Amino acid sequence: MSHIDLALQELLEITGATRVTLRRDLPGDYAFPVTNEALLPGAPSLKEERTVDLKAQPVVLELLKGRQIVQDDCRTAFDDPRFHRMLEAYGGLAAQIVTPILKTRKLVAIVSLHQLGSPRQWGDEDMAAAAQTSERVAALL
C-alpha cells in the first residue's frame, strides 16, 4: 500500500465514510481521473468511471477557487441536472466533503470523502480530517 493509499484509508476509517478518492490533474482526455481510492466493502469504485465531465460540474468550479465543499445532502446542493446525473453515476452519492489540492494556485488534485445512500451531517472533525489528509497527500505528490 502506497503512502497515499494509506492516507486515504485512514481518512475512511476516521470518518466512517463509504469512499475516499484522490483525483489528479493528469494529461489525457479525461479531466481529473481517480488515481487512488479507499472503499468500504461493497462500495463501487470510481477508478474506471468516465461518464461524468468534471469540468462541467459545479463542485469543481468552486474547487478552482480553493474552497473545501461540504454537502450534507447532495440532492439539495445544486439544481444542475449534470450534477444530479453524477450523483447516480457515483453509486448514489448522498453527502460529500471535497477538498482541493492547489499548487501555485492551480488545482492539481482533489480529495473527496463520500457517503453513499443517505444524507449525512458532517462534523467539524470530518472537515478537519479531510483537510489534513489533503495536506498530507499534497506533500506526497
Question: What does each of the following model-derived ranges do?
Answer:
Residues 17, 58, 81, 96, ...:
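Short coil/loop residues immediately preceding or within conserved phosphate-binding loops
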Residues 1-22, 133:
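Amphipathic alpha-helical coiled-coil segments that mediate homodimerization
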Residues 94-102:
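A short, aliphatic-rich beta-strand micro-motif
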Residues 101-115, 140:
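Sensory-domain boundary capping and coupling elements
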Residues 9, 21-61:
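GAF sensory/regulatory domain recognition
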Residues 72-95:
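Signal-transducing coupling segments at domain and membrane junctions
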Residues 115-133, 140-141:
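Regulatory loop-to-helix N-cap segments in sensory/regulatory domains
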Residues 1-4, 56, 123-126:
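The cytosolic transmitter module of two-component sensor histidine kinases
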